[in-house]
Amino acid sequence: MTDDVVDESSDEDVPQRGHNRQPIVSVLGHVDHGKTSLLDMVRSIGSQRQASVMDREAGGITQHIGATEVPADVLNETCAAMLGGKQFKSPGLLFIDTPGHHSFASLRNRGGSVADIAVLVVDIMEGLQPQTIESLNILKETRTPFVIAGNKVDRLHGWRCEKGRSFIESFSSQREDVQALFEERYWKTVGQFSEHGFNLERYDQIRDFRQNVALVPMSAKEGEGLQDLLAVTVGLAERFLEDRLTDTLGSAQGTVLEMRDEVGMGKTVDVILFRGSLRVGDTIMLAGQDGPFTTHIKGLKRPQGMAEMRDAGKRWVNFDSVEAACGVKIVAPKLEATIAGTTLHLANTSEERELAEEAIREEWRAVFNTMPVMCSSCNSIFARQDFQEHTASGPCKGAEENRSGVVIKADTVGGLEALAFELHQRNIPVRQATVGPVNKKDILMAKSATDPLQKVILGFSTKASTSDVASQLEED
């Protein structure tokens, strides 16, 4: 007999996993509820730390691509009081600043949202607001787990804040009347979330995180409760998203946030890389106005130190290679046609190119199928994929699309989808939907509509392509 244990299972039965990458965290919230203050406070941890380690290239928080990367050592130091001597397994957190809900919606790949987990910032004094509800709907649609940052506890009358203190420690030090004020606001917020089908509970009182959404009370302005929020976010990601966070092998993929014209660099694209790695010289495939196209990476860049992406100026650091998950600025030829919100694919081999092209075309088919169209028989409005089912049987069997509708334009795929969704809710069909500036073809298409009410071009974060087009729009 031998003590050796023979594993008879095939290697093919065990999914191949890569290294444990940092979770990608998207921050959402209603205007003025404190999303910007929260991100600023997260960044301030790094600036304070960086001041004490100025000679070290590592350490601190790196700003890049509309994202804030919080390294593991900063997380462990910030949350030390809550960790009790333990340390996180995660190499860090990558916060993505999503300035609009359509931006979050565009951070997706074919498997769902690129964001692994989200933080929804809610002003505990105001509760749920229209954009909060919109955010909840998007999180539900993309099946993204999330944590609630119950912000602005400092606005409770008599609440005493202390920067960096945990909420648990803070709450126990407040007067009884102040605690009662908090409980009143807390239970009101719980009731509002319940109306939308979510079981909300204070994070330190949850027994099963699968059944309840965690609320972390905090003050983003003062930094109180920040360590609680970071600890809960990392803890949930490590506990429930292990398979997703180790799914890093295979050809590189990333979401294009935007195309920019940088002085001294030319056309560049800002990308969130969520799988694989990229090197200078790699061939990549992107979605363009005329379909998929390939180009070669000439440079991979990140801002130096704490510099913001949009204000980095000449303070860029060049990299030979980058690994997921990270944000990176890519310098390459022929990027001007790139469509923001689409997926970048590595395309070094013929097999990779073939798979990338099909994935990009499938991505566009999915967008095309969300457009609202009118049934030629009953004049009802359906999303295109639902229209096909509607006309397969019943009184409208064999009916065709009524080629009427408005023209819509947006700066990103997510913007296009958001606009189409709003129009569908209002029973307005879409005749043509494209990404990019309004051009003469769009004007001709709108003019050709038979219904006067549909001689319209609706733009979402976009403008006229030339001054001539702008003048024509004003005249019409």
Task: Give residue ranges: language-model regions.
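Inter-motif core of Ras-like GTPase G domains
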Residues: 105-126, 133, 137-147
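C-terminal effector/interaction modules appended to NTPase cores
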Residues: 4-11, 78, 89, 122, ...
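Residues immediately C-terminal
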Residues: 33, 101, 126-127, 155-158
